[in-house]
Amino acid sequence: MNDKILEGVMASRVPTSLTKEELELDEQPLTRTPSPQPVTAWVRYGETAVKVDGLLVAWTPRAVAVRWETPGGEHRAWLWSSATRPR
C-alpha cells in the first residue's frame, strides 16, 4: 500500500486498541515511564495494518501503550508487546 493511502487511513480512522478485558489491568502490574522509548510498531486501523515509528509510554507483562504522530495528529493505542520492536 502506498504512503498516500496509508496517510489517508490514519487521518480518517482511529487505531484499534486492546480492550480492557485483554489488558487485565486489575490483575497485571502497569508500568509508566517518564522517558518514552522509541519503537516500531504494527498498528491496526480496522482491517488495515500500518507499521509506525512511535514511543512506548507504558506496559504490562503482555501489552504496551504506544503513541505516534499521524497526518491528523497524535494517535495512541494499547498493543500486544510482540507487535513492537525497539528502534
Which sequence ranges carry the predicted segments?
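Basic/aromatic-rich interaction segments and small domains that mediate binding to polyanionic partners
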Residues: 3-81
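Intrinsically disordered, low-complexity linker and terminal regions at domain boundaries
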Residues: 83-87
